[in-house]
């Protein structure tokens, strides 16, 4: 019986010691005075105190409240970890800000480099600014080159001067095969080709009418067709007609004459065909 009572007593004593151990492991709640002193020591440069320093700090802070040596050790360890986290967070924020600034700096530099390039392209290819003047020049060139463009006095004179250099055949007393050049203004006098001395001469309308009326004194028998056939026997001499009813000189293009004469090898000689008739008419011509 006695050993059993001893075991119960020993078990009861163990339970009391366990309760004391549980009571001793309660959470430490530092007072404001203890926290202020610990922070002053930390700002003073103390980061990892040794065992002797921990005992001294514990003895000094025990006057302001309950504290143990392990509480002092863990406080310094946790405070260093919090400082490292704060420093790491600050470094991350600063690195993020620097990367953003670097990115925006390069983006703005690229945009600033693109703007002068676009300005240079607009100066090299002034499509919008020179569209009006370029369009005017193109319209002028097209009006000069296009055959359907309206005739101006300058272009009509240039066309008449160019036509003067082409080889043409003229029929003074026949009806005009083609209408005269279009007139742009009533003041502009049209130009006509006049056959004088075997060559075409450009004369105004009034002078051409005068010369054609003066040349009507000659008979048609004295004129020879372009292909060498005399027209005296076919058409008798006609009296002089008024200048107002006389037809203007018609200009036949070189291409049309070449197409009409394509079937002949060469013009016929009038002396071989009608030697006698021409000799009799030489007195009148002289």
From Swiss-Prot:
Molecular-function annotations in GO: DNA binding; DNA-binding transcription factor activity
DNA-binding region extent: 23-87
Entry-linked InterPro entries: HD, Homeodomain-like_sf, WUSCHEL-like
Record GO biological process: plant organ development
Localisation per UniProt entry: Nucleus
Chain intervals for the UniProt region annotation (Disordered): 1-25, 128-152
Biological function: Transcription factor which may be involved in developmental processes.
Name of the protein: Putative WUSCHEL-related homeobox 2
Organism placement in taxonomy: Eukaryota, Viridiplantae, Streptophyta, Embryophyta, Tracheophyta
Gene of this entry: WOX2
């Amino acid at each position: 019986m006695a050993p059993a009572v001893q075991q119960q007593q020993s078990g009861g004593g163990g339970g009391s010691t366990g309760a004391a151990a549980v009571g001793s492991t309660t959470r430490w709640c530092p007072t404001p005075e203890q926290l202020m002193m610990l922070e002053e020591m930390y700002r003073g440069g103390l980061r990892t105190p040794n065992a002797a320093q921990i005992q001294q700090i514990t003895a000094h802070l025990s006057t302001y409240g309950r504290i143990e040596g392990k509480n002092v050790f863990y406080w310094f360890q946790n405070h260093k970890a919090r400082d490292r986290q704060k420093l790491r967070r600050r470094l991350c924020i600063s690195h993020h800000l620097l990367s953003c600034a670097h990115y925006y700096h390069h983006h703005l530099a690229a945009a600033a480099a693109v703007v002068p390039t676009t300005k240079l392209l607009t100066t090299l290819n002034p499509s919008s600014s020179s569209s009006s003047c370029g369009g005017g020049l193109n319209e002028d060139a097209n009006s000069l080159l296009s055959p359907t463009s309206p005739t101006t006095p300058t272009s009509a004179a240039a066309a008449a001067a160019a036509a003067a250099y082409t080889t043409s055949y003229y029929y003074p007393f026949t009806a005009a095969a083609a209408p005269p050049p279009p007139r742009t203004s009533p003041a502009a006098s049209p130009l006509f080709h006049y056959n004088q001395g075997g060559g075409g001469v450009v004369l105004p309308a009034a002078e051409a009418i005068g010369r054609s009326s003066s040349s009507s004194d000659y008979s048609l028998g004295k004129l020879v067709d372009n292909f060498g056939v005399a027209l005296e026997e076919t058409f008798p001499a006609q009296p002089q007609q008024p200048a107002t009813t006389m037809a203007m000189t018609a200009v036949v293009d070189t291409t049309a004459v070449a197409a009409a004469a394509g079937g002949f090898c060469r013009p016929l000689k009038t002396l071989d065909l009608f030697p006698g008739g021409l000799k009799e008419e030489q007195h009148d011509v002289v």
